[in-house]
């Protein structure tokens, strides 16, 4: 069971920040209840018709948003100085609390979920059980999910391509979300059941996620040319808000959740590659030079011994990690190993994104060919892809874990390319996707982080999740059903809350306001942390 751990300054800071938010939110709900009750009494008056006419006139100037908040309130919040908003919050001003009730609710719910993380992973209130792998059960559950998803959520899409204006749908958003979803399910089940025999497949799945980072970010920046501070901040918020609070609450290192720093790094590299001299991105030779430069950076960083350690050692405080089970390893070992496995695949994603319009035009021409020629070309593509996939499986995938990892950085593009070719080989395959997996694909970041603490258990700071969370002892399948339902629900809520709070604190067209918000957030965090240090010095 979980051992008692000393409370940290970060945890005290979180409590100091979240308790006032909870109080303000509860009070705002009380104020809203009073206002609604008064409103109901007024409308129960005998002069209902007259009052209704007056109300209709008043409502002409008010447009309600989600949560029952008028649009003018949101404008007032953004137009008010941060200092003014903070004073109104601390003094529990009625109008301010009612105006921002939805935001306070989102912040309070976010805090409550993090508290549940701590309860589940670091206390003895909930139990734990050992992992147990059974191949038959593992395959049964996954195949059952595929069958149910195919029967209930298979959907045809008719989206038009922004490049050709036709429904080619090559590597469309529905397809990539579905791809992320079915991979994520296997990735999570691999952890839950300790399915060590599919380790090499999991490595390919993680490479595919990184490939999508290169593909998706390149597509966005290349097409929309939006290198604004707001867009950059939104990306960093999406990737790191949840994980940052998880590290604070559970006293974990950032590298425990290695997917987050990996995606952050490769997102930054794509942003830098396209953002530098962005006005020349339309010139093919310039783009070729940029991609070649990316390869050069990776080669120098990861292939030349000693360079990685020299470059990253100043960031050891952020990227260092010590596994309690392997304390003898260097602090940067985990970062070197994890980032090195997928050091090239993000560039492959960029290349595929760059040639995406060209391939789409080829596919459009292919669909316009006569039936015999079209069939022969598609059959050839499927046959070649299948043969290449078979060779990779026989000579690379079947290698032992340690040997496979040596080949992985140079070969992970092969199964990814094979899957893309097969998945997009016909118009019918491109038209359809399973929306259940696509839905799961949208919350991969949340499910990845949450699994450590409310699906599995680690019990100690920086510990790997070696146990299962147990709410129903002696009934492993019932327990699996319950904790999975809670886990997926919480992950989805975290996805929604992250986006809700992003819209509140990250202005999209006001860099000055954004900078003020960042500075205010840093100042508040510093004050809370300083206060927590003082409180922890008080003798118990």
From Swiss-Prot:
It comes from the Eukaryota. It is found in: Golgi apparatus membrane. Disruption phenotype: No visible phenotype on cell wall acetylation in single mutant. Severe growth phenotypes (e.g. dwarf and abnormal flower organs) associated with reduction in the secondary wall thickening and the stem mechanical strength in the quadruple mutant rwa1 rwa2 rwa3 rwa4 and characterized by reduced xylan acetylation and altered ratio of non-methylated to methylated glucuronic acid side chains. Absence of interfascicular fibers and xylem cells differentiation. The triple mutants rwa1 rwa2 rwa3, rwa1 rwa3 rwa4 and rwa2 rwa3 rwa4 are also dwarfs with abnormal morphology. Keywords: Glycoprotein, Golgi apparatus, Membrane, Oxidoreductase, Phosphoprotein, Transferase, Transmembrane, Transmembrane helix. One of its GO terms (cellular component) is Golgi membrane. One of its GO terms (biological process) is xylan acetylation. The keyword Cell membrane does not apply. It is a multi-pass membrane protein. Glycans are attached at residues 424, 431. GO terms for molecular function: oxidoreductase activity; transferase activity. The chain crosses the membrane at residues 7-27, 137-157, 182-202, 203-223, 235-252, 257-277, 291-311, 340-359, 377-397, 436-456, 470-490, 518-538. The keyword Transmembrane applies. Its EC number is 2.3.1.-. Expressed in cells undergoing secondary wall thickeningin a SND1-dependent manner, such as xylem cells and interfascicular fibers. Mostly expressed in the middle and bottom parts of the inflorescence stems. Mainly observed in the more mature parts of inflorescence stems, but present ubiquitously. Its main location: Golgi. It is an enzyme of class 2 (transferase). InterPro entries: Cas1_AcylTrans_dom (IPR012419). Belongs to the PC-esterase family. CASD1 subfamily. Probable O-acetyltransferase involved in the acetylation of xylan during secondary wall biosynthesis. This is Protein REDUCED WALL ACETYLATION 3. It comes from Arabidopsis thaliana.
């Amino acid at each position: 069971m979980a051992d008692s751990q000393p409370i940290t300054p970060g945890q005290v800071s979180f409590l100091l920040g979240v308790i006032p938010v909870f109080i303000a939110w509860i009070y705002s709900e009380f104020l809203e209840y009073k206002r609604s009750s008064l409103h109901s009494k007024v409308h129960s008056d005998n002069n209902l018709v007259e009052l209704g006419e007056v109300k209709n006139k008043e409502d002409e100037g008010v447009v309600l948003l989600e949560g029952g908040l008028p649009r003018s309130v949101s404008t007032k919040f953004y137009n008010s100085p941060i200092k003014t908003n903070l004073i109104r919050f601390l003094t529990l001003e009625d109008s301010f609390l009612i105006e921002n009730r939805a935001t306070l609710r989102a912040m309070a719910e976010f805090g409550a979920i993090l508290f549940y993380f701590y309860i589940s992973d670091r206390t003895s209130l909930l139990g734990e059980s050992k992992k147990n792998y059974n191949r038959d059960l593992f395959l049964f559950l996954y195949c059952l999910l595929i069958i149910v998803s195919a029967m209930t959520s298979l959907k045809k899409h008719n989206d038009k391509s922004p490049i050709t204006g036709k429904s080619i749908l090559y590597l469309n958003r529905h397809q990539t979300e579905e791809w992320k979803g079915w991979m994520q399910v296997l990735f999570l089940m691999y952890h839950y059941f300790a399915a060590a025999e599919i380790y090499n497949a999991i490595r390919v799945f993680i490479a595919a996620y990184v490939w999508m980072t290169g593909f998706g970010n390149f597509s966005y920046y290349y097409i929309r040319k939006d290198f604004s501070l707001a867009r950059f901040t939104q990306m960093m918020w999406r990737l790191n808000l949840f994980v940052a609070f998880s590290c604070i609450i559970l006293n974990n290192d950032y590298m425990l959740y290695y997917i987050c720093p990996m995606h952050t790094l490769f997102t930054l590299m794509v942003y830098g590659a396209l953002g530098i001299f962005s006005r020349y991105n339309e010139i093919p030779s310039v783009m070729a030079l940029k991609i070649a430069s990316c390869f050069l950076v990776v080669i120098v960083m990861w292939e030349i011994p000693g360079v990685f350690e020299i470059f990253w050692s100043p960031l050891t405080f952020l990227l260092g990690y010590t596994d309690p089970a392997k304390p003898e390893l260097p602090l940067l070992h985990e970062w070197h190993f994890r980032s090195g496995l997928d050091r090239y695949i993000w560039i492959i994603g960029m290349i595929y994104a760059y040639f995406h319009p060209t391939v789409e035009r080829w596919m459009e021409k292919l669909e316009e060919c006569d039936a015999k020629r079209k069939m022969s070309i598609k059959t050839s593509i499927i046959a070649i892809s299948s043969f290449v996939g078979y060779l990779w499986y026989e000579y690379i995938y079947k290698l032992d874990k340690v040997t496979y990892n040596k080949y992985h950085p140079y070969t992970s593009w092969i199964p990814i390319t094979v899957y893309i070719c097969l998945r997009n080989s016909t118009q019918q395959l491109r038209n359809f996707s399973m929306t259940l997996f696509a839905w799961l694909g949208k919350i991969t970041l949340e499910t990845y982080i949450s699994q450590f603490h409310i699906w599995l258990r680690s019990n100690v700071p920086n510990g790997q999740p070696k146990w299962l969370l147990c709410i129903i002892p002696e009934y492993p399948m019932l327990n699996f059903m319950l904790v999975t339902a809670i886990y997926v629900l919480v992950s989805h809520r975290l996805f929604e809350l992250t986006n809700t709070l992003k819209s509140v604190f990250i202005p999209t067209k006001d860099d000055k306001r954004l900078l003020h918000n960042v500075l205010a957030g840093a100042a508040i965090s510093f004050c809370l942390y300083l206060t927590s240090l003082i409180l922890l010095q008080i003798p118990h």
